């Protein structure tokens, strides 16, 4: 498999899948990303959405911590009003780095997790989470909704109902 670049699947909202289907897809994605990171030691890829991998399925993986995070049919349930800007790259747009805005924190519901997952930092609650992980999860969930990082540039950020 290879990462899709100029493919209409990247601009399409992905189909919901069963947890078993999602796990099978995620295994292939994790294997690909780990092998790719091992081969390209200078550049670490942090996440991958199924549609980038050529599969119309609402599945994403994030490789920031020791164990890969798998999200099947993820949906952002809550998010901070506060946003931060940082540079992002994307496997589907190699060698591109752009400034994007992301929410400081998000709460995500996924079919393969019993409880909502929290990513980011709630300054008002002294919760110093990982804002990089929050940004990567937002980036990958956006892919599953047919959005790319170009849609999150400071002057083109989508409204919450587009998530």
Task: Report each predicted region and the residues it spans.
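Positively charged
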Residues: 1-163
